[in-house]
Amino acid sequence: MLGFAIALALPFTLFALFPSWLKSMPKSGGWMNVIKVTLGFLELAFALKFLSVADLAYGWRILDRETFLALWIVLFALLGFYLLGKIKFPHDDDDTKVSVPRFFLALASLAFAVYMVPGLWGAPLKAVSAFAPPMQTQDFNLYNNEVHAKFDDYDAGMKYAREHGKPVMLDFTGYGCVNCRKMELAVWTDMKVADLINNDYVLITLYVDNKTRLPEPVKVMENGTERTLRTVGDKWSYLQRVKFGANAQPFYVLIDNEGKPLNKSYSYDEDIDKYVDFLQAGLNNYNKKK
């Protein structure tokens, strides 16, 4: 939302500071309509992103990853053809000439659409990982190097870890967390990282913005104030704050079978070597406690 606000306010701010710039602007005409249509396509693309966050949080499953990508591919392909003059709208000029900047913008839009096509079969698409739904919503996936959580419930995951004698990796995340998606596709897809998480840890992913209602509201005390936990996300957010003193995502913490941290927590940092060291240090500390 901050990005939208800045983008809309910046032109007015600049023209207010430098009124003479208005004189150098070309008169309104077809070029203005092209800008409006282009921004309209971009607005639709970002609207789908925000809709996907709500879709995930409430569990509607309307916009799975491949559905989202298919819609984005269509939007950016249409934008590319529009900029090339192949598609006309009612208020567009009849001029068939395409300027050089407009041509390169069309080329970029079409290239972006083509880039996303492999994502329909499960390709990571790191460039759009911050916007697309998580990989686990993909129904058809030819790629098998992704990391998927064994549990999305803390108690069930801890019970499994105790029974199998493995340390636990808690992943506090959110459906609307951009940096979480970046970490999952930029770091977790590394073979060393994926091998450590899949084979040596029990991964429990807890979504702090999960809107699923709890069977019964739970009243808790936090900092001397009574709070009511009404959703699953409220429960995991409360757990993160009270047990680990943090409220940001992504937030990774390695714990033993008693729920005690094995080393320092880890937040957003796409350095793969650091992440491997973080996982290996936790595993070493767990083995020392045995």
Give, region by region, the residue ranges found by the protein language model.
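Hydrophobic alpha-helical segments characteristic of multipass inner/organellar membrane proteins
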Residues: 1-157, 164, 189, 206
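Composition- and surface-driven signal marking solvent-exposed, interaction-prone regions
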Residues: 1-2, 60-66, 95-99, 127-129, ...
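Flexible loop/turn segments at secondary-structure boundaries
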Residues: 24, 51-53, 176-179, 211-215, ...
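Thiol-based oxidoreductase modules, predominantly thioredoxin-like and allied folds used
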Residues: 146-151, 173-175, 185-234
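CheY-like receiver
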Residues: 157-160, 239
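Short active-site neighborhood of thiol/selenol oxidoreductases, capturing the structured segment around
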Residues: 163-181
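Loop/turn elements at helix/coil->beta-strand transitions in domains of secreted/extracellular proteins
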Residues: 164-168, 199-204, 247-250, 257-260
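Non-catalytic, surface beta->alpha helical segment in thiol-disulfide oxidoreductase systems
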Residues: 187-193, 223-289
